[in-house]
Amino acid sequence: MTIQAIIPLVIMGGAFLLIAIVAHTTGQGNLDHIKSKTVGDGQHGTARWATKKEIQQTFKHIPFRPEAWRKGKDLPTDQGLVLGCVGGGPDIGSLWVTLFKQRKKAPERPAVQALVDTDDIHCLMIGASGIGKTAFFLYSNLEYACACGMSFLALDTKGDLARNYGTIASRYYGYQVAVIDLRNPTRSDGYNLLTLINHYMDICREDSENLAARAKAEKYAKILSKTIVNPDGDASQYGQNAFFYDAAEGLLTAVILLLAEYLPPDKKTGTEQRHIVSVFKLVQDLLAPSRSAKGKNGFQVLMNKLPDTHKARWFAGAALNSADQAMMSVMSTVLSRLNAFLDSELEQVLCFDSAINAESFASRKSAIFLILPEEDPSKNF
């Protein structure tokens, strides 16, 4: 190649190098240098980056010090979500010693401050695999929640959250921890869906005048029935079949209340017999024709033995006052909804009392880790 051909290439290479140096030194093209202002008159949208002043006003800057928090020192009091951080950076002290080969006092690393949003907000984290959604974002929020004393429910598909942060929450922050493992139910803590209903019904059995306890038992029974029969919260989507689902909801509430009231734990062993599997078995048994009353099934006979003022009889009124075929359809609807809980492994979870119930979750520092296998849709009930 001749000199005449090389000179233009050298000039072009120098020009590109000069452009690269200018772009690097001026910061053009860096996301940090995108202007925090809208374009035009909003015809392309009004979204923009927040300014430093707005960030300072919107988020609370709280020193993020897990080492001190786990020793019970400098615990934060502002509850919220950790959405970012400022400070930190490389270890300046180690770099100082490496460069200058002397043990003089080096500049300290800037303290990490968490940007905490203390408002009542929801946050959606979206990112590709491996960018740190769990390790950098979720773990930071779990640590901060433990330090603040916030109760939390963590959903997991593999069990990493329970293994990594269950022990930390219990050992260092004094949390009551429950792990509901639907991937390995035999290793899971218990989760009896009727725990609160049984608790308040036991109080009623000891003090029949305690109206508040009975009202709470009925409230939690209605909530459970609504969750099982109409998980979407509205039966109108079923069209002409809405009656059967509404009646099934009332019938299930009645059976749950009867079970909680008249089937106390075994006095000798203390074994709890009131759980969702017992509800299924009772409905199935009551579906059979009665031997004592011709033309009636077991459920109708049982309801006739209750006083007229008993709430269980009221809840089941829609089913009791319908035609025999319609009532059979209502009871079959209840059984079909309870089919999801029939599993020998799941019974190890559902037939034992809960380590944490809804009320203790709200009143004490609690952490519930729910492990849901995404490859097994039968566990999504």
Model features per residue range: what roles?
Residues 1-131, 135-143, 148, 186, ...:
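Basic- and hydrophobic-enriched, low-structure N-terminal and domain-boundary segments
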Residues 88, 100-110, 114-381:
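P-loop NTPase motor domains
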